Amino acid sequence: MQLHILNNPKDAALAADAEFLKQSLFNLLHEEASPLVVETVKLLSTSDDSAALIEKVLPQLDEQQTHDLTLACGLFAQILNIAEDVHHERRRQIHEEAGRGGAEGSLTETVRRLKAGKADGKSVQRQLDNTSVTAVLTAHPTEVQRQTVLSFNRRIRALLPQRERCTNADALARLRREIDTILLGLWQTSETRRHKLSVNDEINNGVSIFPMSFFEALPKLYRKMEHDFQTAYPGVRVPDILKIGGWIGGDRDGNPFVSAETLRFAFRRHADAVFRFYRGELDKLYRELPLSIRRVKVNGDVTALSDKSPDEEIARAEEPYRRAIAYIMARAMGKARALGLGMGCKFGFLEPYASAQEFLDDLKKLQRSLIDNGSRLLAEGRLADLIRSVSVFGFHMMPLDLRQHAGKHADVVAELFQHAGLEDYNRLNEEQKQTALLRELSHQRPLYSPFITYSDHTRHELAIFNEARKIKDEFGEDAVTQSIISNCEQPSDLLALALLLKETGLLAVENGKPHSRINIVPLFETIEALENACPVMETMFRLDWYDALLESRGNIQEIMLGYSDSNKDGGYVTSSWCLYQAELGLVELFKKYDVRMRLFHGRGGSVGRGGGPSYQAILAQPAGSVAGQIRITEQGEVITAKYADPGNAQRNLETLVAATLEASILPDKKDPDAKLMQALSDVSFKYYRELITHPDFIDYFLQTSPIQEIATLNLGSRPASRKTLARIQDLRAIPWVFSWMQNRLMLPAWYGFGSAVETLCEDKPETLAALREHAQSNPFFQAMLSNMEQVMAKTDITLAENYAGLSESPDKAKIIFGMIKEEYRRSRKALLDLLQTEELLRDNRSLARSLALRIPYLNALNGLQVAMLKRLRKEPDNPHALLMVHLTINGVAQGLRNTG
């Protein structure tokens, strides 16, 4: 391990942690692996070309030794990730304890900037009252590690900070033994999934993050928000501006296994987790509030609750708060029982709360009484956190969005029309579709008949909407609030969904006016769809019927923007600029029609799917596009990295809130030069499309990446492609990006950029100067270049050339790889030129350090992957080769800390 990289005194603890974990891992290898494997791993830690070292050593290794070496390299990547995460948290705590104010991206710093920007208390309160920030957890299959492996990692992470606190050799030895034990368990556990995840597995994984992290992190963050705002702006209240949402169990786009049953299962699991949390907190409150009427006064509201208590113990006769809490717990658990949850209550069960608001009202009675009668500290502790939790989580824990492809909605509408004796929907043009749909939406008459046998697809789709209605009735109106139309291209796509909502009781029509219980959310994903977003929405806003629908939903229209497909379609530069332009146009359009806009950003973890630091990404949005309303998807490895630990979760959620408020209250920013950006986009698009439409490109991609092996990794419940893979457009964005990361090209995040800059700046120094100026001062262009810089720092063209050698057509591969290699050279040169630096990551010491530590093991894993892919292509039925490819895919993903 290259610990000389950690020569900054601030990194001394990281160096010590890394060395400590490294020694534990070598202890394990000495016991479990052959001397040749141990020696090879030692050589890798100091090698300048670990892939070449692997190529030299591999012929000497048998299958078991190859397996052990692969696993060891992956484990080194894991422990370095853990050491870095612990160090980041350590530095944050040191920063806070030193009283240096908030770091960039913290609420403390954002509040300071608001104050410095002359924002007054009234404007801040107004903005808080109109702010809604949601991190939406999705089941996108990008987490390569099993939950079992993640659990081992969390245990090591929890133990590692103790190393600094060990005051003697015995304490250090005990810690060493604990970590050695965990590493042994990790070594002897299968790294890969043997079976494909089911939707229910994904639901369980998603739910697990709440007791692990969110139930602790959100109340703490709200308490910090209250402190920061009230310190700067006395009297300012913090409403429920931050929530967690989800797709897991409701997203059926491309996933035939999501059904009404999985939706119901999801909410039962949600409710089970949140009611267990409430029961635990109420039990703790019961123990913490033995206040006696001999010592304190009590408000009449609490006395009334106490009088209805099922807690009849004589010892409680003078303890009204405990008796009231027993009553509240019995009613809350009564609701849990009514929802079919199998959990008990030591006080028995009383009449269930009809809503989370009723539960909340009773808790607030306790709080008010404590404050009124001299017990404010008790009111502002656990009880305040529980009140906030109930307000945020309700009975449903997190709302789930529904999502389906526009074409699937249209298929259901067509069948309903057919059986009702109406027009042939599929033969109608767009204008005729709108007319027919509006006609059916203008009155109460349903099209569906229970006496007709419909296709499996139609029954399946209508069942999900019907189940969503029942869930809203049982778990609360906020349980399901959005229905997203993926691949939305026309106004009829929105009206078709509206008709399905009407057919299933989620949208009612009274006196010709609609009232919806759910938001209709178009998702614009491709370059063409993004360019057409404004015309589609303007058509909708001109409809009196839709205007009335929006009125029933608070006059807010949510728009989802897809980063993944637009990037796959047009490349990173063009995708970024099209998204920016779409937002600019939508801001003006919504102003024109006086509709409030909420943007939902469908970002992945990788730059090729819209990823990158959230703080910079939000601040880079066009002025007026945030306005306090934002939703962002979080998936797979991003959920693990950001939210699996309460401290990490609090910090990352704080960043989302801070950036949203800063972008909303201090939105004064200059848009990039549209003419310059459009020219950059046009040329970049041209070169990107030339590559991916080359007749030999698809074969090159399939043969020189582990795309087909990724499909067998059992990462998620849905298929890797929507249909048989013959074209790039048929491939899902996640495996597309995942594969380019594995072969170390990261092509979707930079291809075309270099040629665009070179073309525009040729003999035009003023254009180069303009681009450099944008690189220094424009948030949009800065974020684009920063993301590109991070990706190019992980790109290794030499390793990528080894993958090119896997092609079955060397002459054709030479041409395609030649195009890629030349574009990489141009793009790297252009990036350095615009950043006016001679090396990548010069100003990002943290990432540079991180990569330098992991690169020996990462490159070794790539070397192993190429060798095993070569063997697997020759011997397709070789189980050892396939397992090794799977292990290297896991290891490379961990080393890069990204998948798709």
Curated annotation (Swiss-Prot):
Its EC number is 4.1.1.31. The active site is at H140, K568. It catalyses: oxaloacetate + phosphate = phosphoenolpyruvate + hydrogencarbonate. It is an enzyme of class 4 (lyase). GO terms for biological process: carbon fixation; oxaloacetate metabolic process; tricarboxylic acid cycle. GO terms for cellular component: cytosol. The keyword Lyase applies. Its cofactor is Mg(2+). Keywords: Carbon dioxide fixation, Lyase, Magnesium. It comes from the Bacteria. One of its GO terms (molecular function) is phosphoenolpyruvate carboxylase activity. Gene3D superfamilies: Phosphoenolpyruvate/pyruvate domain. Forms oxaloacetate, a four-carbon dicarboxylic acid source for the tricarboxylic acid cycle. Belongs to the PEPCase type 1 family. This is Phosphoenolpyruvate carboxylase. It comes from Neisseria meningitidis serogroup B (strain ATCC BAA-335 / MC58).
